[in-house]
UniProtKB/Swiss-Prot annotation:
Family per record: Belongs to the FAM24 family.
Protein name: Protein FAM24B
Subcellular location: Secreted
Pfam families per UniProt: FAM24
Source organism of this protein record: Homo sapiens (Human)
Gene Ontology CC entries for this record: extracellular region
N-terminal signal peptide: 1-21
Keywords, in A-Z order: Secreted, Signal
């Protein structure tokens, strides 16, 4: 009987350690994905903090956005008015 209780206790401790390890790995990965909003500076000047905050902003290149096509293929039953043209992605429906 004590052997069974010891085995269950060891399994529970192992499970707790595994869960904590996974929790900290996910926490660190999510923490690393966030960018710092401002740099902490001792005796900071508000202008420097504003510059540090805005210097880390990323610019989005317009070339990275996929070109949208105007789709005329959306039609309804003959008794209804046709839908206005819409912008759809090339890979829509995939």
């Amino acid at each position: 009987m004590p052997v069974i209780a010891g085995g269950i206790l060891a399994a529970l401790l192992l499970l707790i350690v595994v869960v904590l390890c996974l929790y900290f790995k996910i926490h660190n990965a999510l923490k690393a994905a966030k960018e710092p909003e401002a740099v902490a500076v001792k005796n900071h000047n508000p202008d420097k903090v504003w510059w540090a905050k805005n210097s880390q902003a990323k610019t989005i290149a317009t070339e990275s956005c996929p070109a949208l096509q105007c789709c005329e293929g959306y039609r309804m039953c003959a008794s209804f008015d046709s839908l206005p043209p819409c912008c759809c992605d090339i890979n829509e429906g995939l």
